[in-house]
Structures are given as C-alpha cells and as structure tokens.
Amino acid sequence: MDKYNPNSIEKKWQKYWEENKTFKTSDDKSKKRFYALVEFPYPSGQGLHVGHPRPYTALDIVSRKRRMQGYNVLYPMGWDAFGLPTENFAIKNKIRPEVVTENNIKNFKRQMQSIGFSFDWDREINTTDPDYYKWTQWIFIQMFKKGLAYKKEMPINWCPSCKTGLANEEVINGHCERCGGQVVRKVKNQWMLKITEYADRLIDDLKDVDYFDRIKSQQINWIGRSYGAEINFAVKEVDEKITVFTTRADTIFGATYMVISVDHPLIEKYSDRIKNIDEIRSYRSEVAKKSELERTDLSKEKTGYKIDGLTAINPLTNKEIPVYVSDYVLMTYGTGAIMAVPAHDDRDYEFAKKFNIEMIPVIEGSDIQNCAFTETNEGNLINSGFLNGLTVDEAKEKMYEYIEEKEIGHKKTNYKLRDWVFSRQRYWGEPIPLVYCEHCGWVPLDEKDLPLVLPKVDNYEPTDNGESPLSKIDDFVHTKCPKCGRDAVRETDTMPQWAGSSWYYLRYTDPHNDEAIASKENLDYYTPVDWYNGGMEHTTLHLLYSRFWHKFLYDIGVVPTKEPYMKRTSHGMILGDNNEKMSKSRGNVVNPDDIVRDFGADTLRCYEMFIGDFEKSAPWSENGVKGCRKFLDKVWRTQDLVDGDSNFEKMETLIHQTIKKVSEDYENLKFNTAIAQLMTLLNEFNNLDKISKEQFKIFLILLNPVCPHITEEIWQRMGYEGYVHESSWPEYDESKTILDVIELPIQVNGKLRATVEINREASEDEVYEKAVKDDVVAKYLENKNVVKKIYVKGRIFNIIVK
C-alpha cells in the first residue's frame, strides 16, 4: 500500500468540494435547520495564525456531524474588513485601502480553504462591499428616525498621532494601543447610539439564552445596573444644587464632603467665584491625559483640589461640607458628582486621609482606625438621627420615603453602561447617511439613494483639526437637503468597525437580496443563530452591540426573535510554545500554511482539537503536531486490516461506547477526549488480526468531522458507497455500551486475593463456583469453613471464612 500523502489527498478533496458545492446550504425549508456561526475575522496583512483555526474547526466538526444527522446546516464565513489597521497600512505604503483589503481577503480565503472548512462560500460577505453596507446605513437611518441616534459634544480619548477617538479599551497606561502615542482628552461632537434605552432588556433577556455563565456575568457587569437614589445637595454660596446618585442613601449622615468631576459644568459656570480656578483648570489639563480606566484605578494615589468658593450643605445634617474636584469621579457615570462617605468606602477613605477630612461611621461595629469599614450590607445604623437602630435595608427604605417626602431626591436605577460613541474621524468606514441643512437640521438620505458610497480620495489621513479625510472632498460634502432641496452638507465622520459586525449574521441568511436585509421567509427559517462561538475578548462590546441592534430590529418588525444567538460559547487562545501570547514581536507566531505543508490539514485540525480543553488556553507544541500525524499514519495503515468477513461482535461494546462518547463530546466541546476515544478504538483494531468493513466504516464516519480529507480518501479506496459526508451518523445502543464480561475482584476476609472474568449478570452461586476454582482463592479456603458470602453485583465478591 502507498504511504499516506496528505498534500495530494487534501487538494483532491478540496477541489471536489468546491466544484460540487458540497457544503452549500439547501433551500429546502422543510428540513430542520442548524445555524452555526463563528466570528468573521478582520483580514489583516499577516494572514491566519494557528489560533484562528481553533474555533473554525470546532464548529466545523459540529456542523459536519449535524449534516450527517439530517440537519440543513448553515455554516457561513465572511470578512469584517473596515478598520484602522488597513487605513494606516494604506497611508504608510501609499496603497488604496480597498486594494489592501482585497489582497488580504484572498490570502485569508486561500488559507481557510486549504484547511478544509465546510463553509458555504456562496454566502460570503464583506462589510466593505457597498451592497452590504447599504443595509448597515439603512439600519442607522431607522435608529435615527426612532430617536436612537443623536449628536452630542462629549469628552473622548483622543490620539493626536492617529488623529482619531479611541474607546477606553484602546487606551493602555495613557497611550494609544495602536501607535503607542500619548492620549489626551478632547471634546468632540460625536454621533451616539442610545444603547442605554435597552439596558434592562439586555440584562433581563439573558435568562432566555444558553451562554456560558461567565459570558452572562461579563454582560451584566458591563451594563452595571444598580438601584439607588438621586439626592440634591444645596450649594451655600449660590442658588444651585449638586445632584448625586448613590446606592447607599442610608449612609448620607456619614457624607462629610463631596467630589465633582473635573468636567462638571458648575466649575466653569461659577469660575468667577472660585478663587483657585487656575489651579483647577491646570489640574483638569493633567487629568485629560489619562484614560477613564486609569482615573478609576483603585490602587493609584488620590489627587484633587478643594474648590475654594463652593460649599455644599448635607441635606440631612444641615452641616456645611467641602466640595473637591478629583480625577476618580467621571462626568460620564451617574451625575458626575458623589457624596463621599469616607468611613465606608475605600477610595473616599484614602482621599479623606490625604486631605484630613472628617470621617463619621454610620454602621454599628465600624473600626475605621486603619481602613474603611466596607462590610456594610448588614448591621444597624448609628450616628444617623432618625435612622439609628434600623437595619441597613430598613434604613434605605426609610430614607427613600424621607427624600421623596421632603422633595430633595427620588429613587433611581442607574447603569455603568453609556451610550455608544458611533463616530470615527477616519476614512475607511461606512459613510454616515445624513446631511445637515440650516433649515431642517439633520436629515437622513432617502432609502432609494442608498448606499452612500465611500468616495475615492487621494489622501486618507485625517485633517490636523481631527476631521475625517472626507471633509476635504467638496463634491462629496456639498449636496442638497433630501427634505427641502436647499443647500446642505454631508456628515463626514464614518461608522466604527463595530457597525458591520452588529448584524452580519442576518445577512448570511440571504446575502444577495437587494430589496431588504434578508427576506422575511429566510429570517423566519434561519434565525436565531443556534450556536455562536467567539473569543472571550468579544463577549462584552461586540456581543452587547449586536444584541442591541437585534432588539431594535425586533422592535421595528424586521427580525422574528428578541435575541440573535441562542447559544454562545468561547474558546481559549493558542499560545506560543513558551506559554506567551503569539505575536510578531515575540517571534513565536506559527503560520498554519507551514503545518499544512509539512504535516497536512487533517493533522492541523486534529492537533488543534486535541491540544487541550477547548475553553482554556494551551501552548503550541510541534511534538504534539507530530503525535497527531502519527495517529493519522496509523489510520491510513489500518486499511490493511479490513476483512469483510471478520466478526463484528468481538468489538461491539467498544464500538458502541465510542459512538456514544464521540457523539456527546463533539456537542460538548470536549474534542480532545473524543479524539482520545477514537485513538483507543484504533489501537484495539490494531491488536486484532482483522477487522470488519462495518467496524472501520463507523470509525471513518466518527473521525470525519475532525479529519475530513483522509477519511473521504480511505472511504473511496475501501469501496464504500457514496461519500462519508453523505452518510448517516451512527447511533449507539445504550445496552451495548456495557460490557457483558467483567473483571470481578474476589476477597477472602476482606482482602483482595484474585480477580475473575465473570458475566455481569452472574448469580452469587455462579460467582462462588468460579472463585473457588482460582488457585490463589482456593489456597485461602483450605481447611476453613465458609460462614458468609457478600456479593455486590458487578462490583466485588467477599468470602468470609473461619
């Protein structure tokens, strides 16, 4: 027999699958459907690394298995191709971004096809295609019409080098994640999406979906819903109130100072009264260099200034309390002001110690000698006037009643979640389909005029004042108002990369439809997505944004379900062989092209699934790759053992055990243990002189989702009918997964003396008869009387003698 040569085999089968559209999703909507989705990649210039195929292979395995179980499987792929890295590369190398994107996509697709994924390539999408982003723009217009898109001046993280705004997550230690430059705070007029209107539903509807618990927790924590009250503190010097949000209204008697954000409007409104205004403005300039994450870091030293000229009045004690400005209070959370209770909050305690501010404990048992007393969910109130002696819960309710009765506050639900900044001052993104008219204000384009196509420009760099390159194209900017026909100007900001990825799963259901996002018939049949797998790094922003868009589309009658994904799982990273994250700078990146060339795509697929627990990170090991290649070499050689007349019964129990374990493990993401079971079965095959065609056929079907090329090739060589992918998935008989013959331990007076082979259902007399024939057991029974026999069926047999 010729040697296993994956290079020729794999090209042959990939060509067959492509030419025959083997994995094209059927239009037959009478079949039960299975929609499997993996996050579509950003097509970078570096191409795929070995981390990419891990999730793709995982859901490819599930998809191939489900096809053999009779499902109509939708398993698509596309490209999340807008984004800053492409634009920066285009600027640096003087190449058009669309050319860069096209080349990168070609490379990514070539790599994916070389690994043998069963994607339906007829449904391929690209977020930079005008036929695609026409519908991204359409969704934005619907949001605008419903009041969910609005423009607002707000402070943002600004990178002077990249000349663009950055999300908090893109700022590392005060520097831009992309270029390393110093980030500053800058006020910009930005388009916002009102995701906060959906905050409660985004939390409450998680009960209806099957997500990993840690994914649900991340979503809930990111939204940060908290119940409390807004309370007004009067300002002594002027007719003004400072409003705070607090979850602990019961502790207000312990509020000994207030802190407002450096951006709080009161500072400039009363700048003429603030004696140290220059000092505060200088401090604000320093704070502008920090990200919000840095400003709220609990471990950093507390900084700030007392505002000389504004004093607050505690509405419960009527005492005057100082007002400070500090970086740890954010204008974008709550009201931009806090009442500080230093006896019971770590940050307030550190701040109060530094500025020598009074501390008043209000919970019984508080020891604040060395630190704040923060175990305050239980206990009774002290130093709190009419709340004294009440429990924490009783005191909260009493205080809510009091502030509403006295009209100094009210109960309120608050969220950490902020509205979504939706503008980017860059070129390579979807144009925002709005124009500004002096008479009509902001007006959306007519739907018949979509898509608003991104115009070609000679220079992709943002302007020095931070405007998009589109602002320099006069014939793009100047237009007519769609409403009144007068002169108007277009919005020149573009959408963020998140836009196209917030609804792409819907387009896969009907990717060539030019009348709608997708037909109602297709959306009703294919959605929601049955199983979505992606990285843990995307379980907050991307998952939250797409759930928000989906809920909006549900509200306007476009989609049939409240949630986009019924199941969400995540995978661990593949690390370098030194246990560090793969990166060019560390020199530990492994290119899948090299593995496919040297070992074969099936070896790569097998190793990626055998490397360890799918949900956990695992280091790459070339020895592990070689081990999987040896396994496939052994699979190849096992053809020689097949004899059509061999006895099937000899291996029947192990075969049924393997069908059961592999079937369950594939669905439970336990690919490593499924492959280990297949290795066990293969070893047992090789311990026999011959195996039956039926046994080997079952083995090939079970292995096919992991290693589709070698199994199809052997299948054809063995003369089995049709193709593996057309076969029915084998079913197991539960009764046949249990061994009829077992090894039973035999004890004499509680001590193990032997084991005997016995039928699992053997009676006590049958076991005894077999046991006494064992030479060792017989020796311990000589000249003894058997007084008792203890038989735990299928477990142990104990003979008591005297």
Curated annotation (Swiss-Prot):
A motif ('KMSKS' region) lies at residues 581-585. One of its GO terms (cellular component) is cytosol. This is Leucine--tRNA ligase. Keywords: Aminoacyl-tRNA synthetase, ATP-binding, Cytoplasm, Ligase, Nucleotide-binding, Protein biosynthesis. The lineage of its organism: Bacteria, Bacillati, Bacillota, Tissierellia, Tissierellales. Its EC number is 6.1.1.4. Belongs to the class-I aminoacyl-tRNA synthetase family. It comes from the Bacteria. One of its GO terms (biological process) is leucyl-tRNA aminoacylation. It comes from Finegoldia magna (strain ATCC 29328 / DSM 20472 / WAL 2508). Coiled coil: none annotated. It is an enzyme of class 6 (ligase). NCBIfam families: leuS_bact. A motif ('HIGH' region) lies at residues 41-52. Gene3D superfamilies: 3.10.20.590, HUPs, Isoleucyl-tRNA Synthetase, Domain 1. Disulfide bonds: none annotated. GO terms for molecular function: aminoacyl-tRNA deacylase activity; ATP binding; leucine-tRNA ligase activity. HAMAP family: Leu_tRNA_synth_B. Its main location: cytoplasm. The gene is leuS. It catalyses: tRNA(Leu) + L-leucine + ATP = L-leucyl-tRNA(Leu) + AMP + diphosphate. It is found in: Cytoplasm. ATP binds at K584. SUPFAM superfamilies: Anticodon-binding domain of a subclass of class I aminoacyl-tRNA synthetases, Nucleotidylyl transferase, ValRS/IleRS/LeuRS editing domain.
